[in-house]
């Protein structure tokens, strides 16, 4: 389905130069002279390569229709991730590369949203937040409480993140699955 370039949004799947791309970021740029244009960062669904593309706001782009389907994470099978449809109990096997950096945040029985184009999986959405345990945290340096300085910490999944000075090793925190950043202390 054709649409104007200025209607492109992150998460959409488009076809460009005979290949399928998922849109990572889009930005409307209005230079001082001349017309506005859209700068889009996108990832090739087959190779995983990223590229930037620019279109005038009036240009048309082929947007592919995606179907969202809910699955539950089951287990790892080598370099593949096995998901299960909670309604039909059918299994879907995906390469772990489709998850990108978010792979580290997968947890047993985690609900996932898989984007399909013509039956082919093209992307996976994790829940926006996940609760993890802090395994290592640097000690607090006295005198730093006046500023909003964060300290490095290691999470139970092996991801490093920055946490406020009051967080200690052994505590559970909520982090964003998008970038691994600290949200809050877990309330459990």
Curated annotation (Swiss-Prot):
Keyword set, alphabetical order: Cytoplasm, Elongation factor, Protein biosynthesis
Pathway where this protein functions: Protein biosynthesis; polypeptide chain elongation
Top-level taxon: Bacteria
InterPro entries (UniProt xref): Elong-fact-P_C (IPR015365), NA-bd_OB-fold (IPR012340), Rib_uL2_dom2 (IPR014722), Transl_elong_fac_P/YeiP (IPR020599), Transl_elong_KOW-like (IPR013185), Transl_elong_P/YeiP_cen (IPR001059), Transl_elong_P/YeiP_CS (IPR013852), Transl_elongation_fac_P (IPR011768)
Subcellular location: Cytoplasm
Any one GO molecular-function label of the UniProt entry: translation elongation factor activity
Main location: cytoplasm
Stored Pfam families: EFP, EFP_N, Elong-fact-P_C
GO BP terms, alphabetized: peptide biosynthetic process
GO cellular component: cytoplasm
UniProt similarity note: Belongs to the elongation factor P family.
Job of this protein: Involved in peptide bond synthesis. Stimulates efficient translation and peptide-bond synthesis on native or reconstituted 70S ribosomes in vitro. Probably functions indirectly by altering the affinity of the ribosome for aminoacyl-tRNA, thus increasing their reactivity as acceptors for peptidyl transferase.
Identification of the protein by name: Elongation factor P
Organism per entry: Gluconobacter oxydans (strain 621H) (Gluconobacter suboxydans)
Highest classification ranks of the organism: Bacteria, Pseudomonadati, Pseudomonadota, Alphaproteobacteria, Acetobacterales
């Amino acid at each position: 389905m054709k649409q104007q370039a200025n209607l492109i949004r992150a998460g959409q799947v488009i076809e460009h130069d005979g290949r399928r791309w998922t849109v990572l970021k889009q930005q409307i740029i209005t230079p001082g002279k001349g017309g506005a244009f859209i700068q889009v960062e996108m990832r090739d669904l087959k190779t995983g390569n990223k590229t930037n593309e620019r279109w005038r706001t009036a240009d048309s782009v082929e947007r592919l229709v995606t179907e969202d389907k809910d699955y539950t994470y089951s287990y790892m099978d080598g370099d593949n991730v096995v998901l299960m449809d909670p309604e039909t109990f059918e299994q879907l096997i995906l390469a772990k590369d489709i998850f990108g950096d978010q792979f580290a945040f997968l947890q047993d029985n985690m609900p996932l949203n898989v984007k399909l184009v013509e039956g082919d999986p093209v992307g996976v959405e994790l829940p926006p937040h996940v609760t993890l345990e802090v395994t290592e945290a640097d000690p607090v340096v006295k005198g730093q409480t006046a500023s909003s300085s964060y300290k490095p910490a290691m999470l139970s999944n092996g991801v490093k993140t920055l946490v406020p000075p009051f967080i200690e090793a052994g505590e559970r925190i909520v982090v964003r699955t998008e970038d691994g950043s600290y949200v809050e202390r877990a309330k459990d």
